[in-house]
């Protein structure tokens, strides 16, 4: 495909996607291919049953793209698989049609090329999921089939799905791979039902080498008759032929309550792995990697401050960097200080800005008063049981009630490391869930501080 042909076709797809509903675009446009543009005629390969739709709905799109790229009115010649094969047989030569047909992928993978194992930041919270994903990519269909990855939003499940697909495709460019969300699988099912073309859907999904399904919990929410049945049959067809299946979800298979038991059982045939929110060190590593995409200087204390503000998922960290970029560009700032970062992310934080007006010294004083120890003892290294508890509670409350980063909190507690603060925070948080009297004590202290 020439450069102009590529620009023309990209523009056709862009215009079509902007005018059509997503499900309609996926069904009628997504698998079409431009073979060539010659003498102001675009030769487009597509399913024969979709030609009428193109004629009625996309003629203006092609005209617009034609004038933009070629400054001419572009006509269309639609060709189908049978046409290409017949022409090849009759001509007996390596003409453009044969070459184009050979280049047509059997299925559009829909993989995002930016996701790979190399740019996935590993930590203790995702190490097993990464190891399992790499194993599956290295030997698809033989190890951990299916692979079921579950965890909350924004933790990297989609990244791993695409990394698996891209890794397999790199080793085998002819592999038939499909990445799709469960929601889009349902949409395709609905379209094929309405058009009475279920054989086409079966052909598309049951002959894959690798099926990557994102957010499978969406399938459990749907009561449309036949959707789960079709996925069940697709799963069986692939699994029986040793073809790899990878699924992601926001919950374990056992908690997919509206999914048929026979599907849940099959999801547990292979390996189930969990991804949990990244710890502080992993968040620092993620931010250090992500800031390379921005033309700003991020001092280490700013990175650690941001890592301390968002601990639920990676998406929040990425969003925070976008917020900071917007503010920095507006103010024409090159170096992102903690103050600039705090200003930029204030609106993003779900509960608004935390009470930064509360000094850590005030928290230490109230905790010390409650437990009968001094602030000096809380900051020191003495490790008697009553002092250690007071110190850890004070660190917990400093993390809960202020905007200060973990390193900053550690500094206020005698220069302790951020990992010490994180350990104290996690320990008290876990104890609160098991010890009702401790929970009441901490609530009492919080009320006095407020």
Curated annotation (Swiss-Prot):
Residues 77-109 are annotated as: Domain II. It comes from the Bacteria. One of its GO terms (cellular component) is cytoplasm. PROSITE patterns: DNAA. CDD domains: AAA, Bac_DnaA_C. SMART domains: AAA, Bac_DnaA_C. GO terms for biological process: DNA replication initiation; regulation of DNA replication. Belongs to the DnaA family. This is Chromosomal replication initiator protein DnaA. Residues 110-328 are annotated as: Domain III, AAA+ region. InterPro entries: AAA+_ATPase, Chromosome_initiator_DnaA, Chromosome_initiator_DnaA-like, Chromosome_initiator_DnaA_CS, DnaA_C, DnaA_dom, P-loop_NTPase, Trp_repressor/repl_initiator. It holds the Pfam family Bac_DnaA_C. ATP binds at residues 154, 156-158. It comes from Streptococcus equi subsp. equi (strain 4047). Domain I is involved in oligomerization and binding regulators, domain II is flexibile and of varying length in different bacteria, domain III forms the AAA+ region, while domain IV binds dsDNA. Transmembrane segments: none annotated. Residues 1-77 are annotated as: Domain I, interacts with DnaA modulators. Keywords: ATP-binding, Cytoplasm, DNA replication, DNA-binding, Lipid-binding, Nucleotide-binding.
């Amino acid at each position: 495909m020439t450069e102009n042909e590529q620009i023309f076709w990209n523009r056709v797809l862009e215009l079509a996607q902007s005018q059509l509903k997503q499900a309609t675009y996926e069904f009628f446009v997504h698998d079409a291919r431009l073979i060539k543009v010659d003498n102001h005629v675009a030769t487009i390969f597509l399913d024969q049953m979709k030609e009428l739709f193109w004629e009625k709905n996309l003629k203006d799109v092609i005209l617009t793209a034609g004038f933009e790229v070629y400054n001419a009115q572009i006509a269309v010649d639609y060709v189908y698989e049978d046409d290409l094969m017949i022409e090849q047989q009759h001509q007996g030569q390596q003409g453009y049609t044969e070459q184009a047909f050979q280049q047509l992928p059997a299925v559009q993978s829909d993989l995002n090329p930016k996701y790979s194992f190399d740019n996935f930041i590993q930590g203790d919270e995702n190490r097993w999921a990464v190891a399992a994903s790499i194993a599956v990519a290295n030997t698809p269909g033989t190890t951990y089939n299916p692979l079921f990855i579950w965890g909350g939003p924004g933790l990297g499940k989609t990244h791993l799905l695409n990394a698996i697909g891209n890794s397999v495709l790199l080793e085998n460019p002819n592999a038939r791979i499909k990445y799709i969300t469960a929601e889009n699988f349902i949409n395709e099912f609905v379209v094929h039902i309405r058009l009475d073309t279920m054989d086409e859907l079966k052909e598309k999904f049951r002959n894959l080498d690798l099926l990557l399904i994102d957010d499978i919990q969406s399938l459990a929410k749907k009561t449309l008759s036949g959707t789960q049945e079709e996925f069940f049959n697709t799963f069986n067809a692939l699994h029986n032929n040793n073809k790899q299946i990878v699924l992601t979800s926001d919950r374990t298979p056992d908690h997919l309550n509206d999914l048929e038991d026979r599907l849940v059982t099959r999801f547990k045939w292979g390996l189930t792995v969990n991804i949990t929110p990244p710890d502080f060190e992993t968040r620092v590593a993620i931010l250090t990697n992500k800031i390379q995409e921005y033309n700003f200087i991020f001092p280490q204390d700013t990175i650690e401050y941001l890592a301390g503000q968002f601990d639920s998922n990676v998406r929040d960290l990425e969003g925070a960097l976008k917020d900071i970029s917007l503010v920095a560009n507006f103010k024409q700032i090159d170096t992102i200080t903690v103050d600039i970062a705090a200003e930029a992310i204030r609106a993003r934080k779900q509960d608004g800005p935390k009470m930064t007006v509360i000094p850590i010294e005030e928290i230490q004083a109230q905790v010390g008063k409650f437990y009968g120890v001094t602030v000096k003892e809380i900051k020191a290294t003495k490790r008697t049981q009553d002092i250690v508890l007071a110190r850890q509670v004070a660190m917990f409350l400093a993390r809960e009630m202020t905007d200060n980063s973990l390193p900053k909190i550690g500094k206020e507690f005698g220069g302790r490391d951020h990992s010490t603060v994180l350990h104290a925070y996690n320990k008290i948080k876990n104890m609160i869930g098991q010890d009702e009297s401790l929970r009441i004590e901490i609530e009492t202290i919080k009320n006095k501080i407020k």
